[in-house]
Curated annotation (Swiss-Prot):
GO terms for biological process: tRNA wobble position uridine thiolation. This is Mitochondrial tRNA-specific 2-thiouridylase 1. During the reaction, ATP is used to activate the C2 atom of U34 by adenylation. After this, the persulfide sulfur on the catalytic cysteine is transferred to the C2 atom of the wobble base (U34) of mitochondrial tRNA(Lys), tRNA(Glu) and tRNA(Gln). The reaction probably involves hydrogen sulfide that is generated from the persulfide intermediate and that acts as a nucleophile towards the activated C2 atom on U34. Subsequently, a transient disulfide bond is formed between the two active site cysteine residues. It catalyses: 5-taurinomethyluridine(34) in tRNA + S-sulfanyl-L-cysteinyl-[protein] + AH2 + ATP = 5-taurinomethyl-2-thiouridine(34) in tRNA + L-cysteinyl-[protein] + A + AMP + diphosphate + H(+).
Length: 421
């Protein structure tokens, strides 16, 4: 008689992971629940939300009659996620710690803990996503050391597991999973991948999981909670006062506490001005923030960017991109934004240029460009450089022309790319 398959499910104390564990139990698996504590702090009201979430996760395990474990990754989170978050802001970029957390904590630290310490056959999370494997195929996966050297042994090459969008397109979370390793993905089950949020809530209500059903959905960065973002950031970074300057006439409109506090597209809080102004560019040398009137100002729109070396879910770039050096696909740089048609151009160093079919609003360095082909999430790369804005192109500004023609730019930098922040 075959032993029960052991699935270790990450529990956050929310409804999605609770229902994921319930569904795994219903499928007849031996399920263990694990709560990860990644941040050690009180919010501004003196409440440690992690403790409450841990209690809720423990109660889920009691209701489902499954073992409960708690692990602390506070140190790993600080080193791999939060330090990166601060470093990116100091550089004037706009990081996405959720993507980095999934890569380093949930699908690395937790994955290895589940497999090595708890003897898991597979892990599971409450993410709305799917893979190209059925459950039984997941259980057949074993760790295979990546072939080394120039030539791969043809018998060691495996078909890559695909990361696919969830059935509920509005709740789809493949954006946040776009940096997950192939090794972890092929041993992961996403029980909610084919369900809608409403149906998940219905399942929770019918199975005595009311305590997680009534909780508000967590949004934003887990370590900030309900706190004011500017106040939070200034606890860790030194204020660097500078000016708000109009992109249209270089007029000084006000002052700010630090250019790193603002991201492109964000409304600038400038005292004394009736009309809203929006951040369109930042000067890292002088510490000035350039702003423009109107939310649809052409200075907010760009159609060209360059990424860091892309993390491909399949571990290799798509065959068409390798063959032709160019490929049509779609991308997004914010969760739930509409997919944007684009053309990728592959560079020798593994980075890509992304040319959007039409200019998009509020691109910012530090964000991740996540690529899609149909339902499949191909992977992602961090945005490191931006092309000129529509406003710059319209004006034909001399400084943009000088940046493009700078002898220090390598040919790899592409047309009109500059390291705008």
């Amino acid at each position: 008689m075959q032993a029960l398959r052991h699935v270790v499910c990450a529990l956050s104390g929310g409804v999605d992971s609770a229902v994921a564990a319930l569904l795994l139990r219903r499928r007849g698996y031996q399920v263990t629940g694990v709560f990860m504590k990644n941040w050690d702090s009180l919010d501004e009201h003196g409440v440690c939300t992690a403790d409450k979430d841990c209690e809720d996760a423990y109660r889920v395990c009691q209701i489902l009659d499954i073992p409960f474990h708690q692990v602390s990754y506070v140190k790993e989170y600080w080193n791999d996620v939060f330090s990166d978050f601060l470093n990116e802001y100091e550089k004037g970029r706009t990081p996405n710690p959720d993507i980095v957390c999934n890569k380093h904590i949930k699908f690395s630290c937790f994955f290895h803990y589940a497999v090595d310490n708890l003897g898991a056959d597979a892990i599971a999370t409450g993410h709305y996503a799917r893979t190209s494997l059925e459950d039984e195929e997941v259980f057949e996966q074993k760790h295979v050391k990546k072939p080394e050297g120039l030539f791969r042994n043809r018998f060691e090459v495996r078909n890559a597991v695909k990361l696919l969008q969830a059935a509920d397109s509005f709740k789809d979370q493949t954006f946040f999973l776009s940096q997950v390793s192939q090794d972890a993905l092929r041993r992961t089950i996403f029980p909610l991948g084919g369900l809608t949020k409403e149906f998940v809530k219905k399942i929770a209500a019918e199975n005595r999981l009311h305590h997680v059903l009534q909780k508000k959905e967590s949004m934003g960065m887990c370590f900030i909670g309900k706190r004011n973002f500017e106040h939070f950031l200034l606890q860790y970074l030194q204020p660097r006062p500078g000016h708000f300057i109009s992109i249209e006439d270089n007029k000084v409109l006000g002052t700010h506490k630090g250019w790193f506090l603002y991201t492109l597209g964000q409304r600038a809080n400038i005292g004394g001005l009736r009309e809203p102004w929006y951040v369109v560019e930042k000067d890292s040398v002088k510490g000035d923030v350039f702003v423009a009137p109107r939310t649809d100002h052409p200075a907010l729109y760009r159609d060209l960017l360059r990424t860091s070396r892309v993390h491909w879910i399949a571990e290799e770039p798509p065959a068409a991109l390798v063959r032709d050096k160019m490929m049509e696909c779609h991308f997004r740089f914010r969760h739930q934004m509409a997919l944007v048609p684009c053309v990728l151009t592959l560079n020798q160093d593994g980075t890509v240029w992304v040319t959007a079919v039409q200019a998009v609003r509020a691109l910012a360095t530090g964000q991740f460009a996540v690529f899609y082909k149909g339902d499949e999430c191909l992977g992602s790369g961090k945005i490191l450089r931006l092309g000129p804005s529509a406003y710059t192109l319209q004006k034909g500004q001399r400084r943009a022309g000088m940046a493009t023609e700078s002898p220090s730019d390598s040919p790899e930098d592409g047309p009109g790319l500059s390291p705008l922040l």
